[in-house]
Amino acid sequence: MKKWLSFAALASPLVGSALEVKPWLGNEWEFQFDAAYTYSRYPNVQNGHPALRSSSNDQLLTFDLGAVVLTPKLDFQLEAEFSDTPRQKWGVRSTAAQVRYQWLDDIPGDDFVSLTTGANVRLVARHSLHDVSCPYHSDVNVEVNASVGKEWSRRTSWSWRTFAFGGVGIANHGSPWDRCCAVFEAHFTGSQVIKVFGEGYFGYGDKTRVNIDRFKGWGFIAHRSLDIGAGYRYIFDLWGELELSYACRVIAKSYPQGEQTIQLTYNLPFSFF
């Protein structure tokens, strides 16, 4: 069971998200390397001024390194993002670190559900804060979060599972935010996984109008968004897994609207011990 779980333990299930949100952890002292390419496109920013002259075509490269260390209940993750948009050429967008602790684990059967809580900090490049395609509130962003889920097993592997995630955060400038997601995954033929998901992101600033030319992050904007999507993942046993995901934005207020996103992710587990 743990073997199959570890291949997907540190790759985020959501398009546009990278830091882990699942409640399940991988194997102790096993590292997980993730590389993701994301392409997204949106025609405009709801309540944005001035209107975009053309659709925003954005690219994002994300690299993550995570590991379960010290105890089977604790994992760490480091991340770096590189972006290219009409408002900035290829360069570092942000770096982040996250730590999580698992309080309940349903895989051995001792607990009914799995429950994991965590905290992360993200540092954002100043030039990216002036880009409306960058989703962060300010240059230093801190979040606490929790994830709860349950899986149903068949023989030596899980057959399907579902989980929900919620996080609240604050930056060094602006108002707090919260985000949430719900995910359902089904495991077929030992090596194939499909998923469907929904993700919400909400900011509580006092402004509803987005000044695109003088943008300084989302911390002062009362923004709302809801994305839905699906993905397919193929597991190559010892050589990790490859996943293709798609998401579309169905609700946007004071935020990029009509965004469509495609993400290709490769996950490779490895160990030095």
Where are the model-predicted features located?
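Short loop/turn motifs that connect adjacent beta-strands in outer-membrane beta-barrel proteins
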Residues: 19-29, 70-73, 87-89, 104-115, ...
